[in-house]
């Protein structure tokens, strides 16, 4: 078979060459379609599993944020034909198992304010939800442009704790990085401790047995104490209440378990915490799927989030979830327990919210392709308005523009 080249001369191609050209043309068509559908600087109305949401696009990424909870439920690359979000979708997982799941704001990356863990019996009687009020409220949305950035700001009052929670997502045109800035305002006239966690959670199929790995900027760690080994279809595999150095945790069988890895033969439930590196101002956590050549990560200040809780739910169904939960406290436990303990590893377990005042936090999240052979993250740095991600053993790095910085 022959085709006419640009020179006007006939060129001959093997069938494999023709197949390549067809695939290449399909990719060009897809990217052109994506560019039309996901223009730079777009905010629109959308849904997540039938629930009202706002979509934010910058030509490279598309985010879906639900009005309930200001929850980031999906993040997708414009050039990804799979449209694969790395984030946990419990509604889809339940549906695929022939079950139902009611959305309460808990999915993907949701916020736990003011509370991270179970409410006390008295709080529960007063209507306080598990993980605080912020993820359970319905938010007002305002969107717009700030220079080359598209923004979506979501605001809600937390009626029980008398706080106002405001979260702003900002995405610069064409970048793989999103800035998330939050304000928490007290409406009361006294100082009080605040319990706050960013419940970032990845899920299947991005979370894949024997493939997906998690890296972070910390070492001193502890497994969560527990009493019950078996918990329905999953069982504990870590010794409870034991200190260890990330990522090798003590297993019940006496052998160390590498917590970077997603376990084969899933039927496990893991829980541990890591104190983030006290020698660094900026901390990071990443989730990497080398088979799909995709990476999700976060960069944030240690002064705002000194802890990272690891929750791994690996049922035999393969509908898995893993929390990358950076927070003010090591574990999701009732506030009374947190305040009574005060510190762990000589590090505070809460932050203060002054009377009639406001505290702020900010983090960056990124989602991007990685090169072939990139299999481990040794460091993530924010320098010169760029995020640099390194795999030193492979002698590879990924550099992403991060105009907004921290």
Please name every model-derived segment:
Residues 14, 31-32, 207:
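Short, linear, compositionally biased motifs with a strong N-terminal bias
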Residues 18-20, 164:
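Intrinsically disordered, low-complexity regions enriched in serine, threonine, proline
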Residues 25-36:
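Bacterial N-terminal signal peptides
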Residues 39-179, 187-406:
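Surface-exposed acidic/polar loop and edge beta-strand patches at domain peripheries
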């Amino acid at each position: 078979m022959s085709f006419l080249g640009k020179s006007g001369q006939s060129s001959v191609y093997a069938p494999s060459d023709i197949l390549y050209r067809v695939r290449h043309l399909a990719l060009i068509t897809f990217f052109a379609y994506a560019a039309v559908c996901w223009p730079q600087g777009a905010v629109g109305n959308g849904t997540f599993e039938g629930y009202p949401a706002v979509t934010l696009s910058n030509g490279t990424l598309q985010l879906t944020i639900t009005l309930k909870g200001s929850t980031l439920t999906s993040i997708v690359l414009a050039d990804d034909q799979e449209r694969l979000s790395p984030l946990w979708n419990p509604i889809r997982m339940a549906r695929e198992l022939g079950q139902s799941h009611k959305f309460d704001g808990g999915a993907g990356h949701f916020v736990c304010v003011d509370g991270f863990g179970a409410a006390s019996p008295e709080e529960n009687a007063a209507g306080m939800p598990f993980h605080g009020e912020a993820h359970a409220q319905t938010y007002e949305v305002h969107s717009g442009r700030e220079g080359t950035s598209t923004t979506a700001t979501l605001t809600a009052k937390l009626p029980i704790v008398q706080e106002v929670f405001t979260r702003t997502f900002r995405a610069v045109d064409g970048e793989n990085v999103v800035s998330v800035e939050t304000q928490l305002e007290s409406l009361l006239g006294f100082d009080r401790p605040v319990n706050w966690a960013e419940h970032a959670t990845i899920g299947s199929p991005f979370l894949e047995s024997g493939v997906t790995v998690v890296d972070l900027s910390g070492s001193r760690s502890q497994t969560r104490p527990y009493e019950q080994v078996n918990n329905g279809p999953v069982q504990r595999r870590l010794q409870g209440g034991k200190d260890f150095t990330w990522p090798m945790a003590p297993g019940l069988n006496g052998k160390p378990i590498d917590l970077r890895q997603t376990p084969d033969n899933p039927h496990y439930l893991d829980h541990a915490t890591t104190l983030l590196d006290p020698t660094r101002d900026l901390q990071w956590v990443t989730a990497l799927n080398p088979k799909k050549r995709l990476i999700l990560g976060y960069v944030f200040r240690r002064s705002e989030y000194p802890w990272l809780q690891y929750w791994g739910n690996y049922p035999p169904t393969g509908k898995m979830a893993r929390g990358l939960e950076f927070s003010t406290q090591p574990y999701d436990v009732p506030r009374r327990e947190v305040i009574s303990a005060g510190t762990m590893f000589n590090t505070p377990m809460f932050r203060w919210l002054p009377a009639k005042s406001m505290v702020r936090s900010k983090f960056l999240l990124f989602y991007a392709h990685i090169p072939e052979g990139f299999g481990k993250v040794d460091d993530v740095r924010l320098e010169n308005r760029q995020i640099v991600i390194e795999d030193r053993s492979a002698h590879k790095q990924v550099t992403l523009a991060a105009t907004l910085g921290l």
